[in-house]
A protein has these predicted regions:
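Amphipathic, Lys/Arg-enriched alpha-helical "gate/interface" segment within cytosolic domains
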Residues: 2-150
Length: 150
């Protein structure tokens, strides 16, 4: 069954006997100062099909990125991670939380199927601009551009 899920998307699948040791699991999310602004980058990339680990990392990091003192621009890096409906719903629930008002959200490393899942999950729930950009540098530019997040 897993083979069928990943047959067209091998970059999001990795057979690993110790998934908790994957570099994506250990990669830290962080605030990046950029062009006079700040962006929170939530690194969920390189975690392949280990959705439980992705959601656990997201929940752990959410205690930080939902703080009022953290940037209201956020980028979710999802390269080389299998994005499931459960993960999309978890991200949508967190970024639509009333405790934090995000201005701009960018999803980096998504294909058209994943983009459609995010659009459906955020429909009538989002109070912010969001975009899908596969280039990290372009995503940074979009997140800090004045016209995007006003």
């Amino acid at each position: 069954m897993l083979e069928r899920l990943f047959e067209n998307n091998s970059a999001r699948y990795c057979d690993c006997s110790a998934p908790e040791s994957l570099p994506g699991v250990k990669k830290k999310s962080f605030v990046l100062p950029f062009r006079g602004g700040e962006i929170w980058f939530e690194h969920l990339d390189g975690m392949y099909q280990y959705t439980g680990l992705v959601i656990q990392k997201l929940k752990n990091d959410s205690h930080t990125f939902l703080l009022p003192s953290k940037p209201s621009q956020i980028g979710f890096v999802l390269d080389e991670t299998l994005v499931t409906k459960a993960l999309v719903e978890e991200i949508a629930t967190l970024i639509c939380d009333e405790r934090k008002k995000f201005m701009c959200v960018c999803f980096i490393g998504t294909d058209s199927k994943i983009q459609k899942m995010f659009r459906n999950a955020l429909h009538n729930r989002s109070r912010f601009a969001f975009s899908f950009i596969n280039d990290f540098e372009q995503a940074k530019e979009w997140l800090v551009s004045e016209s995007t997040c006003d």
